[in-house]
Amino acid sequence: MGLLCAGPLMPYRQALLTDQPPKRILVLGGDVDRERAGLQLARQLRLPLVVTGGSNPEYAQWLMEKEGLSAGQVVLDYRAADTLENFTSLVDDLQGDGVEHVLLVTSEDHLPRALTVGSVVAGTRGIRLTGVPVACRTTCPQEGAGKQWSDGLRALAWVLTGQDLKPWARAQMQRLGQRP
């Protein structure tokens, strides 16, 4: 067990045990309320903010100005197309900047899945996530456990292989569906 904790699981152990204060705020885009909450938090805590997959740059710039943040305090990142890519596209940047603790801002219905995926991916770099839920405007149904598990498995596959296996799995399912 000691060898396992000293080997491949060491970054996860470091992430869980870190007592470092947050060094970055990460907003998973897709909802203006998330971005607004992240901007307000960045202003209050005076932390750098990364918005991944958010609204268009012009609107985001307007929101930044409205919240009194400088462009240098906010990074807009449009590389991600889904929750897994939100983390895989940024985790090396965060590690390179010496970030060990991130405040993760997303909608309350999305937070459990985002924390599952993010903890698997960011944990490989010794980065701990603390969730910051944003209330939905109207009632929002919680995402099912199946979605959380499937994305968690995708994240684990990414950790093991370095790639997202979703396109491969989709192609296999299509191939199986085309059999006579």
PLM region spans:
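Helix-coil boundary and N-terminal low-complexity module in membrane systems
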Residues: M1-P22, R36, D164-P180
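A structural signal for short, hydrophobic/glycine-enriched beta-strand patches
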Residues: G7-W149
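A general structural signal for short secondary-structure boundary/capping elements
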Residues: G72-L76, W149-A155, Q174-P180
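Contiguous hydrophobic segments
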Residues: S107-A122, T161-P180
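A transmembrane-helix-recognition feature enriched in membrane-embedded lipid enzymes
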Residues: P141-Q172
